[in-house]
Every structure is written in C-alpha cells, then in structure tokens.
Amino acid sequence: MKNGYYQTKIRGIYKYISDNLYLNRPDVEIKGEHFNSTLLFSLLTGINRGKELIIGEPGLGKTTSAEYVGSILYRYPLGVIWGSEVSGHPEQTEEKIIGRPHLGELNKGKERVVWSNFAQIPVKIVDEINRLPETKQSMILNGVDRGNWEYLNEILINDEYSLFATANYQDRGTNTIIAPLIDRFDVLIESRHPGSNIAYIIGKEASSNHPLRHPQYEKELHQILRGDKPYEEKMTLAEGVCNLFGDYLKEHLGLEGLNKDERNNVNEEMVEIDFDLDTNAFVRMALAELSFCHKYGQKRSVEVCEEGCHYTGYLCHHIKNCASNRLPISIRNYAQALAWFLEDDGVDIEHVRLIIPHVLAHRIQWKDSYLSKKEGEGRNDPFQIYLAKEATEEIFQRYNEQREYLLDALSVGYRAFAGEEVTPLEGDHPIYEEIKKDIGVKDEKPL
C-alpha cells in the first residue's frame, strides 16, 4: 500500500513522541523539514530493522526515546519493553542476556533452554552497553549481527528485530566497545540536552501514569514469553496481544503502530527505492577514500601510511582502519528508509549526506595526529560525529569538483568490465585507481 499510508502512521508516531514523551529541539534539516536526529534515526532503525547506538550524558533520554519508539512502532506495551531490556554491568551473565537451563528438565537429565525476553521479542534494548566488560561483549555478537541466539545445544533465530543500545560518555565505570561489536551498529546518534526551557517543562510535566502502559496486556505477554510453546508459536500468540494493544493505542491516543505484515510491507517498499546516478557515484567515491591505500593495497589498521604519499590530501591518509562491508549496507538501508519516510521517489545525495556521518562516526579510527589537529575546533556535535560530518562534506566538495569526469570514468569502467576494449580514465583520486583494479589495469603512480 503506497500513497503515503504507512508514512502517515510513522509521522504520527514521531509527532506524538516529540510532543508528549521525548520533548526535544529539532537539530537536522532535510528537504525543508526539521527533525530531531535521535527520534528520526530511532524510527528509521525501527522500520528498517537496523541497529542504533545512542550516546549522551546520563539522564538525557537515550534509553527512553528507544523505549517509546519500540513500544509504539511494534505495539508492545511499555512494561514488556522494560522487562526485556538488558543492563550493561560487569556482573552481567549469559543466562540473564540470552537464556538459562530449565531447572525442572535439568533435574530429569534433559537439556532445555528458557529463553530471555530480550532474546525473544523484536525490540531489543541494551542499556549502557559500554559498561559490559570487553570479554562479555562477545556473548552478543551473533545475536546482534544476525538475530541468532545460542545457548547449550539450542538456537533461537529472530525473523525480525531492531536493536537499540545506549552508552554514556567514557568514565571510570565504562569499557571500550570492541571493534567487531561497534561495527555491527548501523548508526551512531547523540541524545542531546533539549535546552533549559524545554528541560523545565519536562520537570514540570513528569508523571508516573504512563500512557504506553497496559497492565493486562503486559501480563498476558509475559505469560506467553515464559511459556513452554515453540518460539514461532509464542510469537504468533504475542502478535495477537500486540494487535489488541495497537487497537488500544488507536482508540485512546490516536496512534497507529504497524503489525508484522505492515512492517514487512514497509520493508518491501523501501528496498524498491533506487539510488540515482549522482548518489551512486558519490557513495563509491566515499568508500574509495575509506578503504584505499596506494602503498599497501588497502587500508589496514596494522599498517601506517607515512608522509609523502601521493594521496596525502584524502581521508585514506588520515585514518587507520579499512571500512568494512557493513558500511555500504548501512548507508543503503538508512538512505532508503529516509527517502521512503520523506516519500521521495529515489535516494539522492541529500539523503546520503545526512546518513553517512552517522554510519561512519563510530566505525572510523582516526590517526592521533589528525585528532590533535581537529580537537580544538568549535562544534555542536560530539567529536566523532563532528569529524564524520566534516569528512562527508570534504568528499562532497571533491565530488562536485570532479562530478562529470568521475561519471565518465565509471562509464568507461562499466564498458571495460563488459569486455569492451577501452582505456580507463586517469584521475587524481583513489576511485580512479579502484576502477583500474576492477578491470585489471596496473597502477603506474610511484609509491
């Protein structure tokens, strides 16, 4: 169903949360519209089944914003969301996160797993993930990446899920999020202070009666999740209760979330949205700067690009690691989700310019020399997001300068790849060397 039917529902969720639950200032603009980035990206995460890392100071709504989006979008009462969250702390165990043995069956000499609510429901929230010790972060790698949860000799596979994790800024109680885990997050967002005037209103209107609670449906869902039925059957029963809660939200709050079929329909609509020619070329140029190394063949975190390289003026000289293959997937999924949300016919450069800094900020490892050079600059964003925004605009400027020539070079590359005898175009950017590699032409530039 097109013509804005689902988008109207999602915009209704955004407006209700923004007006009533997560009071905020808009901090991003696209296509003449203003949005709060935390709320916008949380909704995009929910509809495209993504993974979002929300950073910020304590008490600024990192966890609550994700709870509200997950509750309304997936139509789970807030009490179930609360009861399914995982808290990050040093004593956290696999049994609390994923599942535990069924003690009754264990006494009979049988193995059976009692899965946690976190592993079962599609809305997954990890609060203060950077308080998990690095050794315990590995426990959730496969679950975070693929929705596969393993315990004893059993496996539970989620057919749909969205992950929201929060992290405070570094202090004595936090740990570094390991590289394999941080790379699995699609986007990094900051939950910002709303300003003194809005903060005063929040304090004035705080209430213990939450409109997203429903004790009866919460009890029914907890009973289903604790039951002995097969996982697929439990999810079917849970969806029935969620539909009842959805009816309640519509009747009492005028809110419409999405049932499972509708969420599937939205995903089908999003994947049909194509990138236009300019956006395709711009993303390729960005990926080239984030993975190319003239001296060593590609970026590697264990190899240092020295001064004097021919490509000193590009991002590849300022970073230590190579962009993973998850990066273009994140760009595509979130750019399509944003274009769908705005009801645009295709993904254009304006969409990806908004998306790229947030899919890049947590993945890129900058050289210390570059960090020292930039850290004193004034900014409105946390340092890592600021650097990613600056990098995106640098690439965009280079793209505008070379647009026509780059499009010609890509066209020649396509023809060569198809078997035509052509000479690849020369250019002073890593993307031209990548085109040569793709068609088997040796790079002649000096190391």
Show which residues each predicted segment covers.
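Walker A/P-loop
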Residues: 43-88
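Conserved alpha-helical scaffold flanking the Walker A/P-loop in AAA+ ATPase domains
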Residues: 41-45, 103-124
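Pre-Walker A (pre-P-loop) alpha-helix and adjacent loop at the N terminus of AAA/AAA+ ATPase modules
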Residues: 4-58
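Canonical AAA+ ATPase core
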Residues: 73, 104-109, 128-136, 146-255, ...
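Conserved P-loop NTPase "ATPase switch" module shared by AAA+ and STAND
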Residues: 118-134, 140
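Conserved NTP-binding/hydrolysis module of P-loop NTPases
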Residues: 84-108
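Basic, amphipathic alpha-helical bundle interface domains used for macromolecular binding and assembly
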Residues: 32-37, 215-370
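C-terminal engagement/docking regions of AAA+ P-loop ATPases
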Residues: 53, 58-67, 292-447
